[in-house]
Regions:
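Basic, Lys/Arg- and aromatic-enriched nucleic-acid-binding interface segment
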Residues: 10, 122-130, 141-202, 209-210, ...
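Short, surface-exposed polybasic/aromatic micro-patch for ligand or macromolecular engagement
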Residues: 2-55, 235
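Catalytic-site neighborhood detector that most strongly recognizes the C-terminal catalytic loop/helix
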Residues: 157, 207, 220, 318, ...
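N-terminal core-binding DNA-recognition domain of tyrosine site-specific recombinases/integrases
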Residues: 3, 23-29, 56, 68-149, ...
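Short, basic (Lys/Arg/His-rich) helix/loop patches that form interaction surfaces
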Residues: 117-118, 122, 173-183, 192, ...
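Short, charged, surface-exposed hinge/linker loops at domain edges
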Residues: 49-70
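C-terminal secondary-structure termini that scaffold catalytic or DNA-interacting sites
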Residues: 3, 176, 211, 220-250, ...
Length: 365
């Protein structure tokens, strides 16, 4: 129910009840302006598009701060990523914008400005856009927006360049060049597809040489300040059992004997002075090794990409590759399919055959 009342000042007060039943009012210079406002408000309420005028004055930075503080489900590394994206790439440009002014045009101007500046790179811009879109989806649910203004087609898609693939000979050159205590990390990343975080969390009791399998159940992440924490792998698919290629069995046995304490929960990979390998320590060793063999362009994660490519060349199916590498993509299509451990062992054996063939007659530079 709405009404218009002429005030002693000569202005007209339009009054109405919001969807919660609360009485609200707004004054206008003319009766027609007041009636037009009530007509528009009535339509908005009927279409469920009405928004509390007080919420429209909220600054984006106020909401993003509250939003991040109320996401206890985020992993520490993800929380750190989001905090950095907000602090560096979103709030300096849009933080002082009130929700009533947060339009598609404003978002488009912000997005175009980041791309035009060239820093950060397009991948980071896509991450920032996706985060803003996620936050504003929640703002719609919380009643601050009628619709999400993040509607730029393709803006959240990361167009990363194709990563390089190392040859088997190059992998072994890297393994030979790196410090001996890290040699097995290079080989497991390549031939078992383990991520760096999964390698850093790997313990003695997760390696079964009798069955020739490695059980991946956790990963270790390290924040920018050096804080380390352990948790489940990146996705549910990351929890997996990976067949060990036969040609790596002797490598694993030698590593366990030389570098790993006898306790079942002992980490497979440690630093020279600590029981837990710091990321910076390994990065230094990795950078030295790749420079020594002329592969400065190769990142450690490229070894996992290399292993995926090699496994695919053995004839492994998509679902078998997903199971071996711990990929979560396309899971909906594969929900009723199960990768066979026997088939994974076949893939591992073929990887060994590929390795033996590639190393046969190879000459060190």
């Amino acid at each position: 129910m709405s009404s218009i009342r002429k005030k002693s000042s000569g202005r007209y007060e339009a009054r109405y009840r919001d969807p919660s039943g609360r009485s609200r009012g707004k004054t206008f210079a003319t009766k027609k302006a007041a009636q037009d406002f009530l007509d528009r408000t009535g339509v908005d309420i009927g279409d469920r598009a009405w928004r509390d005028p007080a919420l429209a004055k909220v600054l984006l930075s106020e909401y993003t701060t509250w939003w991040l503080e109320n996401r206890p489900e985020l992993r520490p590394r993800t929380h750190e990523l989001y905090e950095g994206l907000l602090r560096l790439h979103i709030e300096p440009y849009l933080g002082e914008c009130r929700f009533e002014l947060l339009t598609t045009a404003a978002v488009r101007t912000w997005h175009a400005g980041l791309l035009r500046a060239g820093k950060p790179g397009p991948v980071t811009v896509a991450k920032a856009y996706r985060l803003l879109r996620t936050i504003l989806n929640d703002a719609v649910e919380d009643g601050l927006l009628a619709r999400n203004p993040c509607s730029i087609r393709g803006a959240g898609i990361e167009h990363s360049p194709e990563r390089p693939v190392a040859t088997i000979v190059e992998v072994y050159r890297l393994a030979d060049a790196i410090e001996k205590r890290y040699r097995l990390m290079v080989l497991l990343a390549t031939f078992c597809g383990l991520r760096l975080g999964e390698l850093l969390a790997l313990r003695r009791d997760r390696v079964n040489l009798v069955n020739g399998r490695i059980e991946v159940t956790e990963q270790r992440q390290e924040l920018s300040g050096g804080t380390r924490y352990y948790g489940p792998p990146k996705t549910a698919a990351g929890v997996r059992s990976v067949a060990l290629p036969p040609h790596l069995v002797a490598e694993v046995e030698q590593h366990l004997s030389a570098w790993v304490p006898p306790e079942l929960d002992a980490f497979l990979f440690t630093g020279p002075k600590t029981a837990s390998l710091r990321r910076a320590t390994f990065d230094t060793a990795w950078n030295r090794a790749r420079s020594a063999v002329g592969l400065d362009h190769l990142h450690f994660h490229d070894l996992r990409h290399t292993g995926n490519t090699l496994a695919a060349s053995t004839g492994a199916s998509t679902k078998e590759l997903m199971a071996r590498m711990g990929h979560a993509s396309a899971r909906a299509a594969l929900i009723y399919q199960h990768a066979s451990e026997d088939r994974d062992a076949v893939i591992a054996a073929k990887l060994s055959a590929l390795t033996e063939e590639a190393l046969k007659g190879s000459v060190e530079p």
